[in-house]
Structures are given as C-alpha cells and as structure tokens.
A protein has these predicted regions:
Chain B
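Ligand/substrate-recognition segments at binding pockets and active sites
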Residues: 280-353, 393, 421, 454
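Ligand-site clamp/hinge motif
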Residues: 117, 145-191, 515, 530, ...
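Surface-exposed binding/hinge segments that line
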Residues: 49-109, 543-571
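Structural transition elements
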Residues: 248-281, 297-307, 429
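Extracytoplasmic/peripheral linker and loop segments enriched in polar/acidic and small residues
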Residues: 65-70, 74-77, 227, 239, ...
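Acidic-aromatic pocket-rim loops
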Residues: 49-55, 333-390, 433-436, 465-470, ...
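Long beta-strand-rich cores associated with HINT superfamily self-processing modules
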Residues: 423-453
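N-terminal lobe/hinge region of extracytoplasmic solute-binding protein
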Residues: 121-125, 455-505
Length: 317, 571
C-alpha cells in the first residue's frame, strides 16, 4: 500500500528523470501521470467509465425494454424476487436478475437504462451551468465595474437559497418533467461556476504573461479567449466533475418528489419513489436504484477529487 | 386575647357553615336536571317532560322551485322539544340513509353560535368521545364521554394519529405503538395475514375506481374514441395485478351491493382488436397523444395509484397506440379541476359511497349540474332525476336500468374496479370491526388498556365535518358528533339521536322523534332546536352560522340539491 505522499514523490522523481533524459512533459501529461497515481481517482474513473459503457450499450446489456410490462407475457407478478438460474432459481421461471417492479417490468433493465437518463442529465446540466456561469463569470471578472457588480449580486441572490429548494421552486413554476428538472438544476448550479471563473479571471488578468500580451497590442477579445479563459479552466474542470455528481443527486431528489422524470421513465430517483412504500416487503426494489445513485455519485466524487489533486499546481513543486 | 380568639373561632365556624350550605345548594342545582329525567342503565332510552316554554325554530327555504332555489328542503321545523319535521320538496326515498351520514351531525345551537358557525377544532357532540386536544401535525386526543347513552368506551383515551405511507402505519402496529390502522398496502396483505399479532378487518365499502373523460376536449368529444378506450383497457388485468383480495372488476358504475346498482347491461368486454378498429374508424388509426391525470392518494378504490396509472399508460400504448403522459397533481387541485371539467385528458378518480343508496353514486356523478365529464348527457340524468323522486322501488328499477345503459352507451367514464378495502388491528383488540358505511366508533374497540391508538392516512382538515369531505376528518368527527341516524357494523341504517323518523305516504315529509335526555359534551341538553340550527348552519348560505372551514359545505350542497339562499353563480 503506497501512501499518497509516497506516490507523489515517485511521480515527481519520474517526472524529474524524464525532464533530464527527454524533452519536457506537457502540463496535461503531467496531470495525467499525477492522476494515475491517485488510486481513489482511478477507482472513480473506473466507475464512471463503467457507467458510461453501461449507458451506451444499454440495449445490448438489458434483457428487456425498460418499459415493457410483462403481464401476460411471462409467468411473473409484481415485485417478484430476483431469479438467477445459476444461483439455483427454478429453470422454468423466467430469469430476472433484480426481480420485477410494481408494474411487472424487469428491474435490471430499468436500472441499466436509468444510467442513460442520469448521466445525460448530469452532463447536460453541468454543461449548461459551465457555459452560462463561465461566460458571465469571465466577463464580470474581466470587465469589472457595474457589470461585475450586477452579475455577482444576482449570483449572490441565487446562492442565497438552498439549491434543492430553489430547484423545486423553479420546477414548480416550469412544471414537472425531466427537461424542466434539468433546466432548474442548471440554473441553480450557475453561480458556483460564475464565481470560480470570475476569481480565476481576476487573478490571471494581472499575470505577467497577460500584461505582456497587452503590451504587444492584443485586443480584449483575444486576451480573454486566448490567454485568460484557457488558463482559468482548471478549477472549473474539477468543479464540473464534482458538479455532475451533485446534479445527478439533485435530479434524483426532484424525481423522488415527483418533480423530475415522469413515469414510465426509468429514472433512479423516481424508481425509488415508486417503491418507497414497499421498503419492508420488497427492500431490493428500493436498494437497487438507491445503490445505483450512490455508485454514480461516488464515482464522480472520487474522480473529481483525483482530478483536483492532479491539477493542483502546488504538486508540481 | 381569649375573647378575640373566641370571636375568630365563631367567624370561622360561621364561614364553614355558610360554605357547606352554598355547596349543597349548588349540588341541588346541578342535579335538578337529572332529577327531571328518569334514566335507567339497562335501557338507553330516556324520557323527559317537554318544556311548555319551548320555542321551536324553523329553517324555511321560502318555498320549492322558487327563483334561485331548486333544492330538496322546503322547511325543517322543531315541532316541539323532541320532534323535528323535515318537509321536502319531492319524495325522498333515500332520506334515512342520507341523514345517517356523519356530515349531518348535530351540535348544540349555543356552541355553533359561540363559535360563529366554525367549531373547526373544538366540536361539541353527543358521541362516545370528546375532543381533548388537537396537536397539529401529530395527533388528535379524545377523552371518553362517561355520560354516553350508548356503550361507554372501555378506554379512557383515544389517540388518532396519521401516516401517509401504509408501510409506516403498519410499522406503528408491528412495533406496538398503535392498535389499529386504515388501508394496508396491497403488498402487505400476506404479511398481515401471517402475523398472529395482527388481524385483517375486511371493509366491504362500496366504491368505484374509474377513468373519466371530459367531452368538451378533443378527442374525447368523440363517443367512438371513448368507446375504443373502454374496450381497449384490460380491466381484469388491473384488478388481478394491483388490487387486494375482495376486489372485483366493475360491471357497472355502482357496486351490485347497492340496490339497482347493476340494473342494465354489463360493461364492454376487453377486445383490443375491436378497440383498435373502432379508434381507426373514429379517425385515429395511428392513435394520438393525451395525458393521464391522477392524485397520489391511496384509497380503497385505488390502493396503488402510481402502479395503476403506469399500467393504463402501458395498455393505451400497447393496445391503441395512444401516447399518454402521466401527470401527478396535488390532491385538492386535482379534485377541483376534475370536478369542474377542466382536465383535457383521462383522469383517474374514484368514489366511496357515503350512504347506502344508488343516488349517492349515480346522481352525484351524472346529474345535470355535474360538469366533471363535460356536457351532461340528458339520456343519463333525466331518468336519474325521475328515479330519485320515485318512492316506489318497482317504478324506479327500469329508470335505473335506462340510466345504466345510457352510461354504457355514452361512456363518460370507464368503470374499472370495486376495490376491496381493509383496516388492520392488533390481535389484542376485542370487537374490532370495519364497517361498509360510515366509520368505526372506537367505543366498540377494546384493547384492554386505558388508551387506544389508531393510525389513519392523513391529518384531519378540520373537526367540523359539515364542511369537510375527506375521510380523515369524517373519522375524527364520528367519535364526537352524531347524526339523527347512523350505520351499524353491517352498514344498516339505525336510529341514533332520533328514535325514529316516520314518513308520510309519498315520502316527502319525515317526522323525527328525538332521543330524550341526551346531553352534549358541554353539558347542554339535546333538543329539536339543535337539529334545526345544525342543519341551518349547513344549508342556509345566508345564515350567520354558515361559516365552516371553506364555506363550501359541499355535501349539504349536493345531497340536498343545492343550498338555500345560495349566492348567484358568477358569470
């Protein structure tokens, strides 16, 4: 078991050796090296890759369409316990790895397809928040003055509300549904990206290399797009990775409350909500979607933590 | 000094004597009323000498079929202290069944006046329990009415709690925190039946779960579309999969246990091919998009709303290629909007009978004034109106047959199921029951302790049930306030605060003799004016006592065919 500090030292030694023997490593390759040295980050990456593959190949992996009701097609009833033939389940009974849900649909297939919804929702939400928040944060930080004041006060107001509560309020206005839940979660996430981007821009625009560009006659647009924003992205990447986990969790929360994905969409939060009344009689139907949510959030959090460490410039020293 | 002491002693003695005299005169005052009545423990009836000074009150609608009033009530008159006469505008065969409904409970006129017609948290009645306190968000606590004229409760305290999830309610029972609960989840039936510490109390409540259409929205304005959906839904599959034992697929809107409920032809059989053809002929060969609206509230007629909605959605897609989006609405908004005919898709709703008469099912839903299914159908409401005013059962029978056949022909809704409902009690409870009509009164349950705890689905909205419609409020009220008649354990109508109500020949005038010597929880004596004033508070919109909780008095309005002095409808 190599300690984290030890792995950093090894990486740095390797890096130094590489520097001496070969041409210098790029920043991204260094980051990748440092990331590979973080076991938890790699575990997180593994989980995320696994989920992405599961989402992409859902039609191949899932034995049934997610919304197919099996009443009259197979000899199964609602909330049947898992039946796995190799584990001794009667061969004459149809195999359902995770059993069936209350509407006699294959639970395993729904869990598999649920990854599509959750990951899509997480990525889109973060992308919207990153683009909008990043844009306003960058402009506010670079321009300053009254524009900065107005934008950041708006962001402060949004941040003043608990995120899930604000998301619920927005969905209440827009109406329940997956799309509106996505918009609500994105709106709630915007201020975090705006603030981080603004802080980065404020620091970078005073850097020597930016001042040098100014002296060389670069326009404001060139400065912002070519010098400032690319160098401000690092913390935003970390924030976005962690943000995916938060977005998935909030989406599941909204769906649990009936404000997110609507039936028959196999969204994990709504699947959990549908079976909450059967916690004692069919605990697995609550456990499986709950575990899927937990695993996804854990994966993104571990990966985010690993990325943060890997991208930390202090670890270059 | 010694003389002073003697004087002091004399004063003390005099004061004690005076105090003793005063207390004995108080006792005389309080016992005066009981002395005037003769009560025997074995018999529940008491007699009292009617007061010659009694001034009877009258509720006068101003005459039947006058401008703006077309309700059932002509006058309600306190003839003497213990006699009330209900003079109605038309014959009313279901009168006794109707007045037994707990909404028409009697409270003392002085209390109604003192609370401005809104005893929302402090009702006063004659029932086996009195309200002690309402801990908002937690429970309602009742104390035993030791002077109850009926069977006095074995427990000193009744606690009514609530938990929205059936699993949560069952857990309360299993953990020993409660003695009884309402409506277990379908999936919990085997657990309950296998548990020797629990008893499942089947509640044969007549109910109906249906999917309704509003014919003012396309494509539901097309009767063939409605018929196609009626034939394209496998109702048996829904009942088999999602309903507990004791449930049945509905052949008619009204359960067959209600007289005339199943007159006429049975509902359409499931035939997906014929349904698809009919839909294509109606101009929708590729189906269409619609919405399924429902509220996520468990009832005996719909034990698993989400599952049933999802299955109907799947069947519509599979059998008719209709894409239905499911929309879960807040309960109050759903009831309000669906009742007003404001939902453009399919709405999943149901009905639990309030009193044992077919009018309670058909007249409420298909009357001329009901807009729930859009424009009302005269082929349905006209025979219903005639039948509701017909005293002779033989004459009424063909009219109900005609109405039921018209419902099948015009398909304002698709009747799905009559749900089997149940309560659960711990095995320790003796005498536990769940009646088909009305609600349990817990003086008949005995857990052998001092306190009995019952868990229901939700908190009561208020404890003044003249202006409430939800079962949770009615259950709480049933412990405190009694009506002139009530339902026994088997659902039969029996006299309660009245000893009998006798009709005239055409059932349009009912004279009720009241039980004498009954005392309200506040100590006031029950008499005919309390009946007239209680009905006035509910029925007369111009009365200063017509306040209530929402002020709608929905049951008074619909069961008496409208309020007296009702404000003119807007627009």
């Amino acid at each position: 078991m190599i300690s984290r500090q030890k792995s950093i030292e090894i990486l740095e030694a390797q890096s130094a050796q590489h520097d001496l023997l070969d041409k210098p490593l790029s920043q991204w390759r260094l980051t990748l090296r440092r990331f590979r040295g973080r076991r938890s980050g790699m575990v997180g990456l593994g989980i995320v890759v696994f989920l992405i593959l599961m989402a992409i190949f859902a039609p191949v992996i899932a034995p049934y369409p997610p919304n197919e009701v099996l009443i009259g097609k197979e000899d199964v009833g609602p909330r049947e316990k898992p039946c796995i033939h190799i584990l001794g389940c009667d061969e004459n009974k149809p195999q359902h790895i995770m059993g069936t849900d209350g509407n006699v649909r294959d639970e395993f297939s729904r869990i598999i397809y649920g990854a599509r919804i959750s990951l899509t929702l997480g990525f889109f939400t973060v992308t919207i928040a990153l683009l909008v928040g990043g844009f306003f944060g960058a402009i506010a930080g670079y321009v300053g003055g009254w524009f900065d004041n107005i934008v950041m006060r708006i962001m402060d107001v949004i941040l003043g509300f608990p995120s899930l509560l604000l998301a619920i309020a927005i969905v209440a206005v827009l109406g329940p549904g997956l799309q509106n839940a996505l918009i609500a979660i994105a709106i709630v996430a915007i201020p975090a990206y705006a603030r981080v981007m603004r802080a980065q821009v404020l620091a970078i625009k005073e850097s020597d290399f930016v001042q040098a560009s100014v002296a060389l006659g670069s326009s404001s647009r060139q400065l912002l797009l070519r010098r400032v924003i690319p160098n401000a992205l690092t913390p935003l990447v970390v924030l976005a990775t962690l943000g995916v986990a938060t977005a998935i969790l909030e989406a599941a929360g909204l769906s649990f409350l009936g404000l997110g994905a609507q039936p028959p969409n196999p969204e994990w939060g709504s699947m959990l909500a549908q079976e909450r009344n059967n916690l004692f009689t069919s605990p697995l139907l609550v456990f499986f979607p709950g575990f899927a949510i937990m695993l996804t959030v854990l994966g993104f959090n571990l990966m985010g933590d690993g990325l943060r460490d890997a991208l930390d410039p202090a670890l270059n020293r | 000094m010694r003389r002073k002491n003697l004087w002091f002693l004399a004063v003390v003695v005099l004061a004690l004597v005076a105090s003793a005299c005063s207390s004995s005169s108080d006792e005389t005052t309080t016992t005066a009323a009981p002395e005037a009545t003769t009560t025997t423990q074995a018999e529940t009836t008491t007699t009292a000498v009617p007061s010659p000074d009694f001034e009877g009150k009258v509720l006068d609608s101003g005459g039947c079929d006058t401008d703006g009033y077309s309700g059932r009530v002509d006058t309600i008159t306190a003839i003497d202290e213990y006699t009330v006469e209900f003079k109605l505008c038309n014959p009313h065969p279901a009168f006794l069944a109707q007045i037994a409904f707990g909404v028409f409970g009697i409270q003392p006129e002085e209390h109604l006046e003192a609370t401005g017609g809104a005893p929302l948290a402090n009702p006063v009645g004659t029932g086996p329990f009195a309200v002690k306190e309402w801990l908002r968000g937690d429970s309602v606590v009742f104390t035993r009415n030791d002077d109850y004229y009926g069977q006095v409760a074995p427990q000193e305290t009744l606690v009514l709690k609530w938990s929205t999830e059936s699993a949560g309610r069952l857990l309360e029972l299993q953990s020993g925190n409660a003695d009884g609960m309402t409506f277990p989840g379908v999936q919990d039936y085997p657990t309950i039946e296998a548990d020797p510490n629990l008893q499942l109390l089947n509640k044969p409540e007549p109910n109906i779960f249906y999917m309704g259409f509003t014919n003012t929205f396309a494509p539901w304005d097309n009767v063939d579309v409605r018929k196609a959906v009626a034939m394209g839904i496998d109702r048996q599959r829904i009942v088999d999969t999602f309903y507990p034992p004791g449930s049945e697929t509905a052949s008619h809107f009204t359960p067959c246990s209600v007289q005339f409920g199943c007159e006429g032809d049975s509902w359409y059989d499931f035939d997906a091919e014929a349904a698809k053809t009919l839909l294509a002929d109606a101009g929708f060969p590729d189906g269409f998009d619609t919405t399924i609206y429902y509220r996520d509230v468990t009832r005996g007629y719909l034990p698993t709303p989400g599952d049933v909605a999802a299955d109907i959605q799947a069947q519509l897609k599979e059998n008719l290629n209709i894409n239905a989006e499911i929309v879960v609405m807040e309960s109050g908004e759903f009831i309000q909007t669906s009742s007003a005919g404001g939902l453009d898709g399919i709405h999943l709703l149901g009905w639990t009978g309030d009193y044992p008469h077919i009018t309670n099912f058909l007249d409420f839903h298909f009357a001329e004034t009901n807009l729930q299914f859009g424009n009302p159908y005269p082929e349905i409401y006209e025979p219903l109106k005639t039948a509701s005013q017909t005293a002779d059962a033989a004459t009424a029978q063909p009219l109900y047959e005609e109405a039921n056949n018209a419902i099948k022909e015009f398909v304002p809704m698709v009747p799905i199921a009559h749900g089997g409902a149940a309560y659960v009690a711990t095995s320790a409870v003796q005498g536990a029951y769940a009646p088909p009509w009305g609600d349990v009164t817990f003086n008949l349950w005995d857990n052998g302790g001092d306190t009995i705890v019952f868990v229901q689905g939700n908190e009561p909205i208020s404890l003044y049930c003249a202006d409430e419609t939800d079962g949770e409020s009615l259950r709480a009220c049933a412990q405190v306030v009694e009506a002139l008649y009530s339902y026994d354990k088997d659902g039969n109508v029996q006299p309660q605060l009245a000893t009998e109500c006798v009709p005239n020949d055409d059932l349009s005038v009912w004279t009720c003799s009241l039980r004498q010597g009954v005392v309200f929880h506040d100590g006031s004596t029950f008499d005919a004016n309390d009946v007239v004033v209680s009905y006035t508070a509910g029925l007369d919109a111009a009365s200063p006592l017509h306040t209530g909780n929402s002020g709608v008095f929905e049951y008074y309005d619909y069961l008496w065919n409208g309020l007296i002095n009702a404000p003119a409808a807007e627009g």
